[in-house]
């Protein structure tokens, strides 16, 4: 009986339906609402963990837990959801990060009902993006996610919250048009009209159409992944968003871009990917170096972490474009690893802001003695971000480096330059992170004081602005308190899997390796066919790739 139960639909419906009951909860100060929202988030995370543990086969490369029925037949729209090795780990990541972000927002008292309503709607939309197997359904879920994020930044942000929220909305909404165009182009090509992603993968598209749609999807997913030059919304959004919202922005929303590239660009447009892969490599290197230098130049703590995310997403691009099993596996692990690391760093940035009421690194310093636990947790998160051995970040970035270096598609000079430049960017990471720790917790600066009376006056001048890390204005005797048990628990929930995956990467890689190997095999077969058809033209490309003898075919190059 349970074999045919709509588990994935339930995962989406639970937070969405539960959000509708929030207005009915009799609650003035938000205490009951926050417990209700946390209970719903935790229940959904426990549900997905149970379902994947008991009903998901990690050795399978196909879609599992499939549910499909006609929804709006006039538009060819079906409710089609399923998971595979690419989506299942990201669903778990979304569940963990969003549940803990709800717990991190424990002291929100400004419009708490609306806040937790939007958080639960966002929870459902994130899961919907990762499990959708219908292109129109994917587009709907993609758009649904924009609204709560816009409102969460616009209402519970800093003084420039409206500018940051509008910039996020314009960037992502404009980019999502390319997803709709791609959906229509893929669906209506050929004799059969369908939006089902699995069926779209069976069509044989002309290379011109693939290149056009690939470019559009690269823009759409590049905005979400914060690829240069489409990244500028991210530092502004992080700089103005509250800590719980920043946790979701960095921990989950960025990963939607990487997921889309693997699912659609590699999965459906593999011929076009052969031509675009060198461009992805170049963009990845630019992201790594540009993000590193830009991060070092930031005085705002959250903007520094935002540019750090830009840099780390460059490794995802390198892995996706590597044409190797290890490289794509490293890209997946980088998304999962960064989702945990970025979430804990932004959470701890919010914890620090609660005490100091400033994000300016120049105004901080010498608070390590009064907040030793926060200092220790922040240091562990920073070490994970700079890829310290024993942490998940080290494994993912090493896999990408080895994957690119061992690729038999690119020429040796191209690989050498790529690895060297990426290594330069990697060296920048400890520079800007360790300098941030020094400015935060060391130095001779007097710890920043918080004038509660002045804070109240500032709040009155902008009544809709809510400046908080994980809370609003704290009592005077709590400004320099060390981490509370709730905050230690949240940080530990992120740091423990970071360390566990760093020590035993198979905990994560075994969930998706079968699928990423299948995706890479498909892409490599496309490369062989293209090179076999026109080896001279392709060999004259910028990267000067040579045509290897692969496991799939022996390529004969005509003189």
From Swiss-Prot:
Disulfide bonds: none annotated. HAMAP family: NDH1_NuoM. NDH-1 shuttles electrons from NAD(P)H, via FMN and iron-sulfur (Fe-S) centers, to quinones in the respiratory chain. The immediate electron acceptor for the enzyme in this species is believed to be plastoquinone. Couples the redox reaction to proton translocation (for every two electrons transferred, four hydrogen ions are translocated across the cytoplasmic membrane), and thus conserves the redox energy in a proton gradient. This is NAD(P)H-quinone oxidoreductase chain 4-2. One of its GO terms (biological process) is electron transport coupled proton transport. It is an enzyme of class 7 (translocase). One of its GO terms (molecular function) is NADH dehydrogenase (ubiquinone) activity. The keyword Manganese does not apply. GO terms for cellular component: plasma membrane-derived thylakoid membrane. Its EC number is 7.1.1.-. InterPro entries: NADH_Q_OxRdtase_chain4, NADH_Q_OxRdtase_chainM/4, NADH_UbQ_OxRdtase, ND/Mrp_TM. It is a multi-pass membrane protein. The chain crosses the membrane at residues 5-25, 35-55, 86-106, 114-134, 136-156, 168-188, 207-227, 242-262, 274-294, 310-330, 331-351, 374-394, 417-437, 488-508. It comes from the Bacteria. The keyword Membrane applies. It is found in: Cellular thylakoid membrane. It catalyses: a plastoquinone + NADH + (n+1) H(+)(in) = a plastoquinol + NAD(+) + n H(+)(out); a plastoquinone + NADPH + (n+1) H(+)(in) = a plastoquinol + NADP(+) + n H(+)(out). It holds the Pfam family Proton_antipo_M. The gene is ndhD2. Belongs to the complex I subunit 4 family. Keywords: Membrane, NAD, NADP, Plastoquinone, Quinone, Thylakoid, Translocase, Transmembrane, Transmembrane helix.
